[in-house]
């Protein structure tokens, strides 16, 4: 499966931005038809969809689109963009599972990624994630979320810490991937720090609004396969000696961490050697 570490929102009708996005290295490119595309430009953005998705795929990215809620102009968005065969359809401002079921009916046969942008949506995350079998992930917003909470966005992101942790837990419990909120400031250092915080919490994917951040954030979310191999080797050696724990880089390695390292290697197409049997 192609990597999905970074999900870049791109203005729907800005052809220069479309070309820049194709060069930036983000894994998933999203033609954004909501906030990034003023209503007068949406017809133009819809007309660009088909050729745009082909160009993005030729550049090695997954081609996605974010449509407006169906109760506004989302159905008009879908009627146009589905002809371009996007790989993924995202929908903004999903607060309840009923919206997902309506989207699934309106967009048959394509992967769905609902976007959670309000307190109500956050409280319904588990139900939203289980609303349809074609849901590949959920994405949590930043700007709309802080507005709904009645606060403001900061570089440190303290105001969203609980939201991001709660969202990840709900998604994990539902068995779907969680895409972290974008860092909406321009500085690269802050973007990397924000991505590292998300990675430490357990996120494996992050949304972006600045294409210049893509390569650095990709590095943060690229699995450390070398360390996974060391973990497996050390634990297997310990197990062969009759122990159920080992140490790697000073860290205690027990069965859950060992099992996660094996899964990581298998998912990367580098299966570890067969498990050694414990002595005795």
Regions found by a protein language model. Give the residues of each.
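Expand to "…catalyze enediolate/carbanion chemistry for C-C bond making/breaking, isomerization
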Residues: 1-280
């Amino acid at each position: 499966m192609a990597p999905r570490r970074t999900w870049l929102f791109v203005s729907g009708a800005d052809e220069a931005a479309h070309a820049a996005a194709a060069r930036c290295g983000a894994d998933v490119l999203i033609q954004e038809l909501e906030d990034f595309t003023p209503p007068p430009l949406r017809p133009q953005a819809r007309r660009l969809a088909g050729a745009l998705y082909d160009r993005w795929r030729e550049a090695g990215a997954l081609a996605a689109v974010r449509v407006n809620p169906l109760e506004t102009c989302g159905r008009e968005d879908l009627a146009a963009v589905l002809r371009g065969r996007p790989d993924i359809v995202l929908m903004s401002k999903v607060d309840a599972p009923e919206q997902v079921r309506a989207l699934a009916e309106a967009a048959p046969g394509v992967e769905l990624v609902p976007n959670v942008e309000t307190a109500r949506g956050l409280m319904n995350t588990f139900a939203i994630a289980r609303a349809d079998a074609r849901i590949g992930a959920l994405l949590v917003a930043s700007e709309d979320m802080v507005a709904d909470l009645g606060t403001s966005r900061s570089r440190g992101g303290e105001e969203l810490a609980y939201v991001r942790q709660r969202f990840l837990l709900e998604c994990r419990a539902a068995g779907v991937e969680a895409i972290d909120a974008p860092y909406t400031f321009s500085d690269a250092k802050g973007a990397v720090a924000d991505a590292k915080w998300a990675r430490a919490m357990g996120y494996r994917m992050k949304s972006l609004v600045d294409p210049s951040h893509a390569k650095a954030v990709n590095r943060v979310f690229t699995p450390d396969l070398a360390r996974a191999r060391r973990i497996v080797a050390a634990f297997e050696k310990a197990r062969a000696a009759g122990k159920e724990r080992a140490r790697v880089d000073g860290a205690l390695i027990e069965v859950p961490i060992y099992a996660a390292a094996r899964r990581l290697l298998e998912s990367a197409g580098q299966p570890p050697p067969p498990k050694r049997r414990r002595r005795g």
